[in-house]
C-alpha cells in the first residue's frame, strides 16, 4: 500500500513538471520574454507581479543598456509597486557564463544599477530598492549556445513585503 501511494505521488510530481513552461524567456535582445496568462490571480500577489507584469528584463551581450521592451516592463513594475507602497524590491543583475567571474559580477552590477536608475527616474522611491549582482553564478540554464546564453543576460526584480505574498 505504501509503495502504491509513493508511486502515485511520483506520477503527480512528474505530470506537474511536464506542464512547466520552459519557454518563458522568448523575445529579442533588450526585452523580456513572454509571460504566461495570469488567470484569476489576485492583483496584489507576487504571482500576479511575476506572471502578468513580468519580473525579468533581458540585455544584449556585454551591455547594461535598457531597450524599449525592457523599459515598458519596468514602467509596469513601477506602476504596480506604487500601488503597494509596503513592498520593497531587490534587483538582481545577471550575466551569461562567458567571461571571467569578476567581469560578469561587474556587468551584473551595471545591469542592476541601470534598472534601479530607470525605476527611480520613473517615480519609484530609491529607499524601496536595493541591488545585488550574481554575475554568472546563478544561470537560468547552463549551456553553450547563443540562444541559451541570452536567457542568462538579465535582471530580475524580486519583491518583498506586503500581505499578499502568495
What does each model-found stretch correspond to?
Residues 1-8:
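Bacterial N-terminal signal peptides that target proteins for export
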Residues 15-18:
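C-terminal motif of bacterial Sec signal peptides marking the signal peptidase cleavage site
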